[in-house]
Amino acid sequence: MWSLDPSQKEVLRFAVSCRILTLMLQALFNIIIPDHHADAFSPPRLASSCSVDQLVEGLLGGLSRWDAEHFLFIAEHGYLYEHNFAFFPGFPLALLMGTELLRPLQGLLSQRSCLLVSVALLNFLFSVLAAVTLHDLGCLVLGCPRQAFYAAMLFCLSPANVFLAAGYSEALFAFLTFSAMGQLERGRSWASGLLFALATGVRSNGLVSVGFLLHAQCRGFFSSLVVLNPLKPLFKLMASLCLSVLTVSLPFALFQYYAYTQFCLPGSAHSVPEPLVQLAVDKGYRITGGNEPPWCSWGLPLVYSYIQDVYWNVGFLRYYELRQVPNFLLATPVAVLVVWAAWTYVTTHPWLCLTLGLRRSKDSKKTLEKPHPGFLSPKVFVYLVHAAGLLLFGSLCMHVQVLTRLLCSSTPVVYWFPAHLLQNQEPLLRSVDTVPEKLLEKNSPPGQKAPRNCIMKLLYNWRACSPVTRCILGYFLTYWLLGLLLHCNFLPWT
C-alpha cells in the first residue's frame, strides 16, 4: 500500500475528479449530440442487446469511437482482419482481464457491454496511476517538488484527455512508460526494461524507449571507464546494449511472428462468423485463411509496416497535402511546446547537449554548466531527446493529428516544460507558498492562504494570470473539453 504525502494525495484527488468529470461529460455529449456518420470501422453486433445493454451503450458508447472499435473488436473476436494488426495486443488483453472480473455481470450484460464497462474502469485506473507516477518521476528527475506537482496536475488536464478515457491504449501506455522511467531513475534497470517491454506490447512507439536504457548504460560506462583497461567494460557494455534492445523489441517481434502464422502459414484458418466474413467481402478486408498477402514473401515479413503503408497511407511526407492543413493546425500547439522546450534547454546547456549527456563523473567538478533544478536539470536531457525524436518522426511520417496524443502519452516533457513556465512566469504562484510538500492538511491554521490545488487557484483568478499562463491553461482546457465533444460523437478528433 502506497504511503502518499500531501502533494501525492492532491494529485490523486484531482486525477480522480477529472476522470469522473470526463466520464460524465462524454455520457452527456453522447446523449444530446447526434453521432456523425463517419467512414470508420464499424463491425456488426453479433449478440442481441437488451435494455441494460442499451443503457450501457448510451452512457459509455462515447468511449467506443474511431480506433476504439478496433480494440473492442480484437478483445471480443481476436485478430481476424489483417488491418487489426495495426493495434497491439497489450490493451485488448487488459480488457479481457477486466471482463473476467465482470464475469458475475455477464448474465445481465452482453460481451460488448462488459468490454465497455472494462474500458471505463481500466482507463480510469490507468490514467490516475499515470498521474501519480508522473509526479513521482518528476520528483526524481527534476529535483524540484513544486514543478513535479504542477506537471502532474497538468497531466490531469491533458490535451489528450479523451484518448486517456476512451477505448484507446494511451492511458495504459503512459502508466507503463512513466513507471519504467521511474524505475530506471532509481537504478533498477531490469524492472525498467521489463516495463518498457510491456509498453512496447501496448504501442509500437514503445520501441523508441529503448533509448533510455541505452543512454543510461552508456552514461554509466563513461563515468566508470578505466583508460588502462577499457576492453572488459566495453564488452560488458555491448552485451548490455544488445540485451536491452532484445528485451524491449521482443513483444514487437512476437506480435509480428503471430501475424505471420495467421496469414502466411497453411492451416491457420479459423471459424469466422458469417456476418464478419460478409463485412470483409463488402469492405475489402483481408481475413485469416484467405489469399496470402504480399508481405508474406518479404525478406523481413513485417505486417505492421505493410498495414501502415497500405491501409493508412503512412509514410515520409505523405500527409503533406493542402486538405490536411486543419490537422496540422490541431497539432501545432504541442509541436510548438516541444520545440520551445528544446530551444530553451539547448541554449541553457549547449555543452551538455553536444556531449549527449555522457560526461564522465570526475568532470562534474568542472563548471561545464550550472546546476539547475527543475526542467533545466541535466537529467532532463535524454527525455528531451526522446520528445524531440517523437515530434520529428511524427511530423514527417505519421498522420500529424496523432501528434497530440502520441506526445501527451509518451513523454513527460509536455508537462514538465509548462510546469517550468508556470513556476517562473506566473506571479500568482510565487505570491504565496504553494510548495507541494507544504500543502495544507485539514488541521492547518485558518489564516493560511496557500491553496491545495494550484490549477484551480489559477482558474479562479484567470484575469490576473500572466499571458503565458493563459496560453498554457487555455490550450490544455480547450483540447481537454473539445476532444470530448467531438471524438465521442464520431466527429474528426483522432
Swiss-Prot record:
GO biological process, one term: GPI anchor biosynthetic process
GO cellular component labels: endoplasmic reticulum membrane; mannosyltransferase complex
Job of this protein: Alpha-1,6-mannosyltransferase that catalyzes the transfer of the second mannose, via an alpha-1,6 bond, from a dolichol-phosphate-mannose (Dol-P-Man) to the alpha-D-Man-(1->4)-alpha-D-GlcN-(1->6)-(1-radyl,2-acyl-sn-glycero-3-phospho)-2-acyl-inositol intermediate to generate an alpha-D-Man-(1->6)-alpha-D-Man-(1->4)-alpha-D-GlcN-(1->6)-(1-radyl,2-acyl-sn-glycero-3-phospho)-2-acyl-inositol and participates in the seventh step of the glycosylphosphatidylinositol-anchor biosynthesis.
Annotated protein name in UniProt: GPI alpha-1,6-mannosyltransferase 2
Stretches in topological domain Cytoplasmic: 1-13, 99-113, 158-161, 214-234, 349-379, 492-494
Phylogenetic placement of the source organism: Eukaryota, Metazoa, Chordata, Craniata, Vertebrata
PANTHER family linked to this entry: GPI MANNOSYLTRANSFERASE 2
Pathway: Glycolipid biosynthesis; glycosylphosphatidylinositol-anchor biosynthesis
Species assigned in the record: Cricetulus griseus (Chinese hamster)
Compartments, as annotated in UniProt: Endoplasmic reticulum membrane
Transmembrane segments: 14-34, 78-98, 114-134, 137-157, 162-182, 193-213, 235-255, 328-348, 380-400, 471-491
